[in-house]
Regions:
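Basic/polar, cationic surfaces and motifs that engage anionic cell-wall
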Residues: 76-80, 84-161
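N-terminal catalytic cores of peptidoglycan-degrading enzymes
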Residues: 1-72
Length: 161
């Protein structure tokens, strides 16, 4: 499965966060891939390795527990991709200006590759908002699923929102 996220701040801010040591499990944060506003794709964590993109979470009732002190999560079996938030989204509001054409183009290419490499059903692409069991996450805000679906369809893949 794939969980879509947003950075909330700039790409460089996200990278600085990932470079800061977080020794406690509950403080871990990372994504497999980041997509900048210009469409640049940054691969950060090997897709075969675990990224820490979603805390207390489940997808279709599934989760895994690796630390008995923490609640279950999809992190052990999910790929995490985050899009850089536009400057208007550097706040806690429910929406922002949205993502760029370049981001949707790059997102579709990355997802199409993952769909084919990992034999993922397109219906296994979801958002952080939809897997978050704590009700604290609403990302990616201002995400237009139809823009992604159009691009995946053009690549021969379909995505069910």
């Amino acid at each position: 499965m794939v969980v879509l996220h947003e950075t909330v701040y700039s790409l460089s801010s996200a990278l600085n966060t990932f470079m800061t040591p977080h020794p406690r499990d509950e403080d871990q944060v990372s994504y497999h891939t980041l997509v900048g506003q210009d469409g640049r794709v940054l691969d950060l964590v090997d897709p075969l390795s675990r990224a820490y993109g979603a805390g207390y979470s489940a997808f279709l009732g599934e989760w895994a527990i690796t630390n008995k002190k923490l609640k279950g999560s999809v992190n052990n079996f999910a790929l995490h991709l985050s899009m850089e938030t536009p400057p208007s989204g550097a706040n806690a509001y429910g929406s922002h200006a949205g993502y760029t054409t370049q981001q949707y183009d790059a997102l579709a290419l990355v997802l199409s590759g993952w769909i084919r490499s990992f034999n993922l059903p397109p219906a296994a692409i979801t958002t952080h908002r939809h897997v978050d069991l704590g009700g604290e996450r609403g990302d990616p805000r201002s995400f237009d699923g139809s823009k992604l679906q159009t691009r995946l369809a053009a690549l021969g893949d379909l995505c069910v929102s």
